[in-house]
Design a protein with these regions (language model features):
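Short, well-structured alpha-helical patches and their helix-loop capping segments
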Residues: 122-126, 130, 157-161, 188
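Context-gated lysine
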Residues: 6, 32-35, 53, 75, ...
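Short amphipathic alpha-helical interface segments
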Residues: 151-155, 164-167
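Short, surface-exposed helix-loop/turn micro-motifs enriched in polar/charged residues
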Residues: 25, 62, 66, 148, ...
Length: 283
């Protein structure tokens, strides 16, 4: 894998990682970030995006930034209220930070742009197997996580290039920026495939457990509702028969008797007394 070194204005992102092929927007308010966007717009509209390891850091240094970032093309810049600038970008390719060049106004990075050649090393049958596995697992993921179910997975069936398929799926699944950073840092196709598959399998497992728990809770709630309705219906029937609370009291005695710790002979005498009282109540 060869590399090309280039200098690019740089923005440090907080709580956000953008992947190649992804169209996304972010807001910047730090003076250095705004200046970096302005510098990029005056040149080729390319900007280097690095994600902060600690989103709370106000003045991030190289040590507080992930070394693998994204070269992106700025599509639109909008000035917002409160001195915010909203930037719309499209991810072009992953790149690595080599070093920062001294400048007080904004971050200027010397970046190493990768020229990917790992795809040709994967045998055709292996590549096809990887594509089919991704399609299958993504469809399963959509079944659990999308309102449209399997229908949401149909667009990827038109993609037959492994690298493009990986980027498309990675951009469509709702995962945190740290997980996306793992995908971004997987430079070779094989590494990226393995990271994405691990994420998909984990998300499917979580969704399966979540659905099982939801079904158990639903079943329990429905059972409790059925029992409540039956009890209310039985109460109405007893009232109609003039047996308002007598039968209920007898049942309570029966339940208490079962729980009572006493010799069998004592329980039998109590049982006879309860039965006698119940009969007298219906005379």
């Amino acid at each position: 894998m060869s590399s090309i070194i280039k200098q690019l204005p740089t923005v440090a992102l907080r709580g956000l990682t953008i992947l190649p092929g992804m169209v996304a927007h972010f807001d910047v308010s730090r003076e250095k970030s705004i200046k970096a966007v302005e510098e990029a717009m005056m040149d080729e509209q390319e900007i280097f995006l690095l994600t902060q390891k600690n989103p709370e850091e106000e003045e991030p240094t190289a040590e507080n930034l992930y070394s693998i970032g994204l070269v992106a093309e700025i599509k639109q810049v909008i000035k917002m209220p409160n001195d915010l600038v909203r930037v719309l970008v499209e991810g072009i390719e992953r790149a690595e930070l080599n070093c920062f060049t001294e400048t007080e106004e904004y971050l200027l990075a010397e970046v190493i742009r990768f020229t990917e050649d790992g795809l040709e090393d994967i045998p055709e049958n292996a590549r096809e197997a990887m594509i089919r596995c991704l399609e299958e697992k993504y469809e399963q993921f959509c079944t659990y996580n999308s309102k449209n179910g399997k229908e949401a997975a149909k667009p990827i069936q038109e993609i037959h290039e492994l690298d493009r398929l990986i980027d498309t799926i990675a951009n469509s699944i709702p995962i945190g920026y740290e997980e996306k950073q793992r995908i971004l840092e997987a430079v070779t196709i094989t590494e990226r495939y393995e990271v994405l598959m691990a994420i998909l399998l984990r998300e499917i497992d979580i969704a399966t457990i979540r659905n099982d728990l939801a079904m158990k809770i639903k079943s329990k709630v429905e059972k409790n509702q059925r029992e409540y309705i039956l009890r209310e219906q039985l109460k109405v029937i007893r009232e109609e028969l003039g047996e308002d609370n007598t039968q209920s009291d007898a049942e309570q005695y029966e339940e208490s008797l079962k729980k009572l710790k006493a010799p069998k002979e004592v329980k039998e005498r109590i049982q006879k007394a309860v039965s006698y009282t119940h009969l007298r109540a219906h005379e």
